[in-house]
Design a protein with these regions (language model features):
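Bacterial N-terminal signal peptides
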Residues: 14-24
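Transmembrane beta-barrel domains of Gram-negative outer membranes and organellar outer membranes
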Residues: 29-135, 147-151, 159-161, 175, ...
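Flexible, glycine-rich linker and terminal segments associated
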Residues: 33, 182-186, 190, 194-196, ...
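Membrane-embedded beta-strand positions in outer-membrane beta-barrel channels/transporters
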Residues: 47, 60, 71, 106-108, ...
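Outer-membrane beta-barrel translocator/channel fold
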Residues: 89-108, 112, 124-142, 146, ...
């Protein structure tokens, strides 16, 4: 729920992601009950999977190594039953497919079909490496049963790689030959076909930290033992593996293993749980109390004669603006009548919009005269009035300390469209023009280059933002490299498409310092339920031009539609303000839908930066505390051959609010996107301040989800 939240995508996101996994404890009971992660980084035994699942929403990172085989895996428990993983593996000295050291990327999906009961085991169906090169491709059906509190057994049947040793035949027919091509495409015709082989194992939970495991593996490791012309890097003498894993407190697990009768293996797993932040509760300044008015029989406190006295309304405006500022809120305007007040404000501190609404309402009770009964609070982002929350002052007074006060206040609140600024609105003193600047570190990363799993650059970024009036923004950022190897990549454009993203290394090599962006933006409301944006300038590191967008999003609706058109030219590699000779007209029409339970869907159809036409499908899961994880895939008229390695654009993304780390309210979050490979097909323009995410957090669905924090 990051509307208007400052998202640090490539500036500090990689550091924050590492911190999420390294610093975040998991809940004691949840952590002890969670199954161990295997060497593939998924819930399992040692090298084989199990039917158990991680706690809902958990993010896990696992690094493992044995016999020249190194794997790094990010695993997401997408729902209580669905687990997804992205893996990057390196096989040293394999001498395969023209590479001495061979690197491979893969995706896994696993779905728990059956929960464990008193008699029946848990049952899971899984696809391993279902959309990669197929090097680790396999499928499985596995069951796990807890026999005693300290003893679990697992048995399963594997196909593909997991059916390559000790098979019992091919119950569903022969497995078609793999047609990997450029990789990156699922091959459903192969799934659960070919030889099937049993696997299994036993886990002994010695105590709440130590687990001993023994397993029988159905993976023959044909390639790693010298098959298909590769060098033998593993001597597979036995199908048996033995291991011990040990929990280091609540956030990490280490493991040691004896693999296949010949090799020693090690692993390290780090986990983070969105339901259990490092800091329990919420820190920061306490909210103001609701100031109760005197009884109506107590004199003239409710008289509205103050409205006729010169300067009184202006005095209330100045006092309220100062009090709001002390609590991280910025007034844009205040409109007063004898009985109503409309406050337009910017939320500069609270990641939960409902908390900002509650703090503003409390401040209004402190300042405004007793005759003002109706508070209409209009949150604004970039000058866009996003919604209007109307509260009765008497409800605030009556429900502040009620056990179910938040729920009852929500029942009585009205949430609707903001409408236009009233003609009698008084602008906040010192509100505009507004100028802010910041100097700080940034980290840019490149993940999973086939020649190197991680490249990074550390530097300083100077950013500034000037707003002469609501809705008009001038902003920019300048970067200077301090250290890193982001410019060492030698992989450049090899596809048939224009190099709109694949030449990123040239920008890193020749652009130092570089203007990350420099633009002007105008935000406006063309009508009820409508939002508009026009942005012009150097929009991102690789492109500059003009972008225009309109969004239809009623406050009460789960559904939204948007349209965006961009006319852009590619920026020069090393010239701060120059351009290259490639320009493109691109844009999309978009549909957004909030399914409920935190799931958000988005479909974008249109023309991409390389001129290809198609659609992007995105599904995110958002937690009430602001965590968001999701996946996307783009399909265009660019063929797999034209796209190059990976066949089509796809990836996963994770966003974590800073407040989750600190317990202190903050509008900043860290986000990172992981693609198996970055190519030119399906590439979209990166425009600051797109409308949907800017306004959605102030609409009914998000406000209701967060309303429990209205009194905090």
């Amino acid at each position: 729920m990051n509307s208007g939240i400052r998202v640090l995508r490539d500036r500090a996101a990689p550091v924050a992601l590492a911190a999420v996994l390294a610093l975040a404890p998991t809940a004691g009971a949840r952590g002890q009950e969670a199954p161990q992660l295997n060497l593939y980084g998924v819930s399992g035994l040692i090298d084989m999977p199990s039917a158990l699942s991680q706690p809902d929403g958990r993010v896990s990172a696992t690094a493992s190594h044995f016999s020249g085989i190194t794997r790094g895996t990010l695993t997401f428990q997408i729902t209580p039953r669905l687990e997804g993983s992205f893996r990057y593996a390196g096989l040293a000295d394999l001498n395969y497919s023209g590479y001495r050291d061979y690197y491979d990327r893969s995706f896994d999906l696993a779905f728990r079909l059956l929960d464990e009961g008193r008699v029946l085991p848990a049952v899971k169906l899984g696809l391993q490496d279902f959309a990669g090169t197929g090097l680790f491709s396999g499928e499985y059906l596995v069951a796990t049963k807890t026999l005693t509190p300290s003893l679990r057994v697992t048995a399963g049947l594997g196909w593909g790689r997991l059916g390559s040793y000790g098979d019992i035949g091919a119950p569903f027919g022969a497995r078609p030959a793999a047609n990997v091509g450029r990789g990156g495409k699922p091959s459903p015709g192969q799934w659960f076909r070919g030889p099937a082989a049993p696997f299994g194992g036993v886990e002994w939970l010695v105590n709440d930290r130590l687990t001993l495991t023994a397993e029988y593996s159905s993976d023959a490791y044909d390639l790693e033992t010298g098959g298909s012309g590769a060098s033998a890097i593993l001597d597979r003498k036995s199908p048996l593996n033995f291991g011990a894993s040990y929990r280091l407190g609540k956030r990490a697990t280490i493991g040691g293993y004896y693999m296949y009768g010949s090799a020693v293996g090690v692993s390290l797993s780090l986990v983070a749980d969105p339901y259990d932040p490092p800091v329990a509760g919420s820190t920061g300044p306490a909210p103001l109390p609701v100031l109760e008015r005197p009884a109506r029989s107590g004199g003239g406190a409710y008289d509205t004669g103050w409205t006729a006295r010169a300067g009184v309304a202006e005095s209330y405006t100045a006092q309220l603006a100062g009090l709001l500022k002390d609590h991280g809120l910025a007034m844009e305007s205040l409109t007063l009548t004898g009985t109503t007040a409309e406050l337009r404000l910017r939320n500069r501190r609270y990641d939960a919009t409902a908390q900002a609404i509650g703090r503003a309402a409390r401040a209004m009770t402190q300042i405004l005269p007793a005759s003002v009964e109706t508070f209409r609070i209009v949150p604004s982002i970039d000058g866009l009035a996003a919604s209007a929350v109307t509260l009765r002052r008497s409800d605030l007074e009556a429900l502040e300390h009620a056990p179910d006060g938040a729920a009852r206040l929500l029942e009585r609140a009205q949430i609707g469209d903001a409408g236009r600024v009233p003609a009698a609105a008084m602008l906040a003193p010192d509100g505009f023009p507004s100028f802010t600047w910041q100097l700080g570190p940034y980290v840019s990363t490149s993940y999973f280059d086939p020649d190197s799993p991680l490249r990074a650059r550390l530097g300083l970024e100077l950013s500034a933002r000037y707003e002469p009036r609501p809705g008009l923004v001038f902003a920019g950022a300048l970067r200077k490299k301090l250290a890193g190897n982001l410019d060492s990549s030698r992989r450049f454009n090899t596809s048939a498409l224009p190099p709109v993203r694949s030449n990123a290394a040239l920008y890193a090599r020749e652009g130092d310092p570089d203007v990350e962006n420099l633009y002007a933006a105008y935000y406006f409301r063309p009508g009820d339920n409508l939002y508009g944006r026009v942005t012009a300038g150097y929009l991102e590191r690789m492109f500059g031009g003009v972008s225009a967008e309109v969004l239809w999003k009623p406050v009460d609706s789960r559904l939204a539609f948007g349209a965006e058109v961009n006319m852009v030219r590619q920026r020069a590699y090393g010239d701060l303000f120059g351009f290259r000779d490639y320009d493109v007209l691109n844009g999309h029409v978009s549909a957004y839908y909030e399914f409920g339970n935190g799931f958000l869907g988005q479909v974008d159809v249109g023309r991409y930066l390389a001129g290809d036409v198609g659609a992007t499908f995105t599904l995110d899961r958002e937690f009430r505390n602001g965590w968001k994880l999701g996946a996307f895939a783009t399909f265009t008229d660019a063929s797999a051959a034209a796209f190059g390695e990976g066949s089509f654009d796809k990836g996963i993304r994770l966003e974590v609010p800073l407040s989750w780390f600190t317990g202190t309210p903050s509008r900043t979050s860290a986000a990172t996107t992981i693609r198996p490979v970055s190519r030119d097909g399906g590439a979209r323009l990166k425009v600051p301040g797109r409308l949907y995410e800017s306004v959605r957090g102030y609409h009914r669905q998000v406000l209701e989800d967060q309303w429990g924090r209205v009194w905090r």
